[in-house]
Amino acid sequence: MIRFNIDTNSKAAVYRQLVDAVTEAVRKGSLKAGELVPSMNALADELRISKETVKRAYNILSKNGILEARQGKGFYVADDSTKDSVSVLFLMDKFSIYKQEIVHGFHQVLTVKSEDTMLLFNQDISLFEYFINENLGRYDYYIISPHFSLDQNTQEKAMKIIKRIPNQKLIIVDRLIPGMIGNFGAAYQDFENDVAIGLEQGLMKLKSIGKLNVITLPASLYGSLIQRKISGFCQENGIEVEFMSCAPEKVRKGDAFLVLTSQLDPGLISLVDNAKGMSVGTDYYIISYNDSPIDRVVLNGLTTISTDFNEMGREIARMVNAKTLWKKHIDFKMNKRNTF
């Protein structure tokens, strides 16, 4: 029989330690669906704590859907395999147009009824931790976009917090935290390397132009990673590259731009304004980073390099439908339209 370790000298309440210990055992598979857990009396005696403390922990675990009480038999690890609906917590850094595409794709493919909750943590690790603490054990699936500051301490803290969620309930979207392992689900892009895959699909034209002007946002979370890969790609292929934080005042005929900010940000708008009198796609060229449905009509078709956010949502829905989790890197490509 599994043993739980409780530290009565810890600042953490004993009942909370027990809740976390049982949740972790379920996450790791040490306790399996349908398995009987120790009775309240037996566990109280084993841990030398009060029965009321065990009762409080078991009640919380039952409320959170981790355990279920069976009349006259005791507490068992909950088995949700026969449910005809799922509860889903979308825990997103922000609800951008791209996150909307993920959610839209998810519901296009999902074959069971879902009860969704969405919480936004704005890349704030403390708020993220609060949301996890408040909602641990309450949902069938936790779909998380783990975008935080890239410093080591924050990344390690994020990983530690996320690992509190049972693997079989955890699905990561958009980004994998380096070094994070486990049998959780994931549908993601590779922020450091994918940009080269997209640019490769326009290589012949870029070589004929000879130079790529990159309009970037200095505060972008992954800007430095993406810029480093762009620099390497251009160097390897003999293409001159220049990075700028805003659109140039004068756009010259033959200029090619990669806009790393959103298609609705000032970078693209200023660029088009400063190129009045010239025809985009003929006199000068624009590639935008990240694709959304509106790009099909912007400038009669805005060329993008992007992962497929809709497919990302579809892939995680396939996991929920199959009740089996896996990891998949979503294809990154150039969507060729009017502007390039």
Roles of regions detected by a PLM:
Residues 78, 83-197, 256, 263:
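Alpha-helical recognition/docking segments in bacterial nutrient-uptake
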